[in-house]
Amino acid sequence: MVQPQSRVKVVDNSGAKEIVCIRVLGKGRNQLSNIGDIIIGVVKEAIPNTPLKKSDIVRAVVVRTRKGLKRKNGIYIRFDDNAAVIVNKENNPRGTRIFGPVARELRDKSFMKIVSLAPEVI
């Protein structure tokens, strides 16, 4: 789960390396996000000479969490890190590559562009 003040690794080539979550969209008072939720974050670490700079405010989709996720068939899926992909207002990724696996639940939440760019869908 990702909540406000959580540090999240960015797994695309948009230029940011790490963001800090400041808001979870669509959750109301319960500010806990899971895989497929959109968060608002601030770039804390960025690669030089890229469009995203430190202290930029961005939208991102959570693609991996350390918290276990139970599927309908009874399988628990868990990742080693909390990771997100930076998206624009239309929920299309800003980068052109995605690094590492993403969860199959993104397909159910209609993030097909992210699923198609990912090297592995678990």
UniProtKB/Swiss-Prot annotation:
What are the alphabetically sorted keywords of the record?
A: Chloroplast, Plastid, Ribonucleoprotein, Ribosomal protein, RNA-binding, rRNA-binding
Any GO molecular function: large ribosomal subunit rRNA binding
Superkingdom is: Eukaryota
One GO BP: translation
Gene Ontology CC terms, in alphabetical order: chloroplast; mitochondrial large ribosomal subunit
The subcellular localization recorded is:
Plastid, Chloroplast
Asked if Ribonucleoprotein is a keyword of the record, the answer is yes
Give the family, as the similarity comment puts it: Belongs to the universal ribosomal protein uL14 family.
Q: Which PANTHER family match?
A: 50S/60S RIBOSOMAL PROTEIN L14/L23 (PTHR11761), LARGE RIBOSOMAL SUBUNIT PROTEIN UL14M (PTHR11761:SF3)
Q: Subunit comment for this entry?
A: Part of the 50S ribosomal subunit.
Q: What does this protein do?
A: Binds to 23S rRNA.
Name of this protein: Large ribosomal subunit protein uL14c
